[in-house]
UniProtKB/Swiss-Prot annotation:
Coiled coil: none annotated. Interacts with translational regulator CsrA and flagellin(s). Acts as an anti-CsrA protein, binds CsrA and prevents it from repressing translation of its target genes, one of which is flagellin. Binds to flagellin and participates in the assembly of the flagellum. The gene is fliW. The keyword Chaperone applies. Belongs to the FliW family. This is Flagellar assembly factor FliW. The keyword Cytoplasm applies.
Amino acid sequence: MIFSVKSPILGFEHIKTMELIELDKFFVKLASKDDETSFTMINPFALRSYEFDIPSYYEELMDIKESSQLRIYNIIVVALPLEKSTVNFVAPIVCNMDNMTLSQVVLDVTKYPQYGQAEMIENFIQK
């Protein structure tokens, strides 16, 4: 699935087109079509309760309507073992499946203090 980047991933502002590749039911790969950059992402709902309001700026930018089919992912920094990998819950990637656009939405940490920028996956695994 090829997406047009409407609001760039921080530090990767030059990337305008990305491909979303499903790896399994939890993980996806987001690969740039402009260079060799790629990100491993996770479905946050597989780990925790995760809710936030999409600011109106992003809704307009991505033409998000109430009926829009959205997918939310979070970038992870992969480590071994996998449980030591960290998840960025502060800046989710929002994908609008209706028009194939995506944006990185940076959440206001004062509004969402429960979400961290580098939370270990092991903190969400039942032991």
